[in-house]
A protein has these predicted regions:
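GIY-YIG nuclease catalytic motif and its immediate N-terminal context
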Residues: 1-66, 86, 93
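A broadly used, surface-exposed interaction patch
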Residues: 60-88
């Protein structure tokens, strides 16, 4: 039986994008997270509540801006929460 080696990756998620500014997600290949968050306007921070989706795309910007599961994501939000996104670049070849 042939064995297949497992490739290991280190992902660097830098920052976050709130639903209102998700257009800032780069048009690059990578892994993205969709999560429930609470935005603190006084401190300009978000508090991660729950990761609700993990995806991959050759163009994360296009995928997130036009995500076909947006209604499903919004249905998971609780009072005062909003959707937030994180992105880690991964070369297309990987």
């Amino acid at each position: 039986m042939a064995t297949q080696s497992i490739k290991e990756y280190s992902l660097n998620f830098q920052g976050y994008w709130r639903e209102a500014n998700k257009g800032g997600v780069p048009s690059k290949s990578g892994i993205y997270l969709v999560y429930r968050c609470l935005y603190n306007s006084e401190q300009n921070t978000v508090g991660l509540k729950e990761i609700i989706y993990i995806g991959q795309s050759v163009d994360a910007h296009e995928r997130i801006v036009n995500h076909d599961k947006l209604d499903e994501f919004n249905a998971k939000l609780q009072r005062g929460e909003e959707l937030c996104y994180s992105f880690a670049e991964v070369d297309e070849e990987n």
